[in-house]
UniProtKB/Swiss-Prot annotation:
Transmembrane segments: none annotated. SUPFAM superfamilies: L35p-like (SSF143034). It comes from Sulfurovum sp. (strain NBC37-1). GO terms for cellular component: cytosolic large ribosomal subunit. This is Large ribosomal subunit protein bL35. The keyword Transmembrane does not apply. Disulfide bonds: none annotated. InterPro entries: Ribosomal_bL35, Ribosomal_bL35-like, Ribosomal_bL35_CS, Ribosomal_bL35_sf. Belongs to the bacterial ribosomal protein bL35 family. PANTHER family: 54S RIBOSOMAL PROTEIN BL35M, LARGE RIBOSOMAL SUBUNIT PROTEIN BL35M.
Amino acid sequence: MPKMKSVKGAVKRFKVKKSGKIKRGTAYRSHILTKVDGKHHRQMRSSKHVDTVDAKNIKEMIN
């Protein structure tokens, strides 16, 4: 049986950390950010972690 291919879009969007948690970027950061206040804009800069409910599916897509 052949190996499962990883989903390339998921590989580009997510990184698995040493602890096993999955790191992701923040949404709504592509354009029209002049309307967003400074505090929200700064908070969106930092990366987030994927929820444990979604982590299993994402790990299957990556591996």
